[in-house]
Amino acid sequence: MAERLNVLFLCTGNSARSILAEALLNRLGEGRFRAWSAGSMPRGEVNPHAFPLTRALGFSDEEFRSKPWDEFAVAGAPRLDFVITVCDNAAGEVCPIWPGQPISAHWGIPDPAAATGTEAEIAVAFREAARQLRNRIDLLLALPMAKLDRMSLQRGVRDIGETADGASE
């Protein structure tokens, strides 16, 4: 595997979960990873409730945009090592053929953008999604990448998505 690993997080709308995952891995990966996000049917704008969480990680709002996954399946796109879906709809869709045959996995997270209620209740839903994503990203970061063959790494990344909320036991 390359020294710096490239990860694409996918979601249908690319407005909340995948954006949060991109921000978290770019911050927590400390240069070992480069993350992006995209959607099969991007909403065209990031959900405003995601911004307080990305700002808390030290990012500006302008660093994120809702974009189609096709941008990553064309010549000149970054070579992807991992493609991870974070919503059930994207997991069931036919994805583009990614150059380089990246390792794929599904880490289902409830959609905070579907939360209703007061601003405080919606903020709680976004924080909970970010917590679950962070738990899974922490597990990804703990994998001994250099010591695992491709099949073991595939299994390890997929197993992360099968933990109840990403918490290690």
For each of these PLM feature ranges, what is it?
Residues 2-169:
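Short polar/charged helix/loop
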